[in-house]
Amino acid sequence: MNSGIDLQGTFIESLRDLGIPAGTAKAIWMPLPMILMLIGATVGVLVATWLERKISASAQQRIGPEYQGPFGLLVPVADGLKLVFKEDIVPAKSDPWLFTLGPIIVVIPVFLSFLIVPFGQNIVISNVGMGVFLWIALSSIQPIGLLMAGYASNNKYSLLGGLRAAAQSISYEIPLALAVLAIAMMSNSLSTVDIVNQQSGYGILGWNIWRQPIGFLIFWIAALAECERLPFDLPEAEEEIVAGYQTEYSGMKFGLFYLGSYVNLILSSLLVAILYLGGWDFPIPLNLIAGWLGVSELNPVFQIITASLGITMTVFKAYLLVFVAILLRWTVPRVRIDQLLDLGWKFLLPVGLVNLLLTAALKLAFPFAFGG
């Protein structure tokens, strides 16, 4: 198996070769992953918002952004600058502390969740042993911020939006966790790196989507609900409750909610790609590609090329799912709140439990095919 590139080890060794002590080299490395994570997530949001505008324009037979830079690529930057310079209004009868903390509590857990996302064998900020459940734990903090924002606004529509967000998150976190548990059962690990490694070696046929089709659908539906994307955007339904918990917000506080929403969408798409679509794994096994090219899998140049293409493969799979999510937003009608809760509690939860039991039975009956 291609072991990939040890990014941290290579960086520290390079600094030590320059005469920098090991302790200093490690201290220099420590903030770099967080900085790279912030830059990567921000660029990802810019791309996702541009895609949103272009795909929505295509669905409505419009051209979409085209004047701000080539193909309108600078529109997300212009939107961000507009929000930065807008006045930050705090309602007179609101709770200013909770009103300010709400959007911050929403955004921080989403960015922290990128710590466990691997883009390659050793290209991961923190290979935590319980990485997937760390993400679920962090995502459960978000509804607190949304409820806080809705309550602090002193607005009935904001409060309704916050309550809807909390109810929706609780309803779909359990099916999401059950789908993840089935994957962990097959992989014998909760580490995202181990889960991808368990899928590698057989190309597209080894991906978990074939062994867990029901789990894939549960995870994808629950992830869309957690991201509050149509048809599950009940907490901010314009026709019913103006803008939900965002009603009284303006300026960058308003922008933080949208930033959190898009970063969450990208994060969820990355995790679907990692858990079910092989992550950085190629559709064709690497040993076959190396054989066709007449090179060894251990060749350093081949490893660098495959590691680089592996990052591209992970991002491509994720943005393919982002495209599907955006397309769903502009083609599927919104469900009612009772339908939303019924889907979570009365359908996805029992189906997730049955899927988990079925996975356990198949793992016992066919250990080689289901993780050993």
Curated annotation (Swiss-Prot):
Organism phylogeny: Bacteria, Bacillati, Cyanobacteriota, Cyanophyceae, Nostocales
UniProtKB keywords: Membrane, NAD, NADP, Plastoquinone, Quinone, Thylakoid, Translocase, Transmembrane, Transmembrane helix
A GO CC annotation given for this chain: plasma membrane-derived thylakoid membrane
Record protein name field: NAD(P)H-quinone oxidoreductase subunit 1
Broad enzyme group: translocase
Major site of localization recorded for this protein: membrane
Reactions listed under catalytic activity: a plastoquinone + NADH + (n+1) H(+)(in) = a plastoquinol + NAD(+) + n H(+)(out); a plastoquinone + NADPH + (n+1) H(+)(in) = a plastoquinol + NADP(+) + n H(+)(out)
Gene Ontology BP, a term: aerobic respiration
Pfam families: NADHdh
Recorded topology in the membrane: Multi-pass membrane protein
Transmembrane segments: 27-47, 97-117, 128-148, 166-186, 204-224, 249-269, 308-328, 351-371
Organism: Nostoc punctiforme (strain ATCC 29133 / PCC 73102)
Domain of life: Bacteria
MF (Gene Ontology): NADH dehydrogenase activity; oxidoreductase activity, acting on NAD(P)H, quinone or similar compound as acceptor; quinone binding
InterPro entries per UniProt: NADH_UbQ_OxRdtase_su1/FPO, NADH_UbQ_OxRdtase_su1_CS
The protein's role, per its UniProt record: NDH-1 shuttles electrons from an unknown electron donor, via FMN and iron-sulfur (Fe-S) centers, to quinones in the respiratory and/or the photosynthetic chain. The immediate electron acceptor for the enzyme in this species is believed to be plastoquinone. Couples the redox reaction to proton translocation, and thus conserves the redox energy in a proton gradient.
Family: Belongs to the complex I subunit 1 family.
EC number(s) stated in the UniProt entry for this protein: 7.1.1.-
Stored NCBIfam families: PRK06076.1-2, PRK06076.1-5
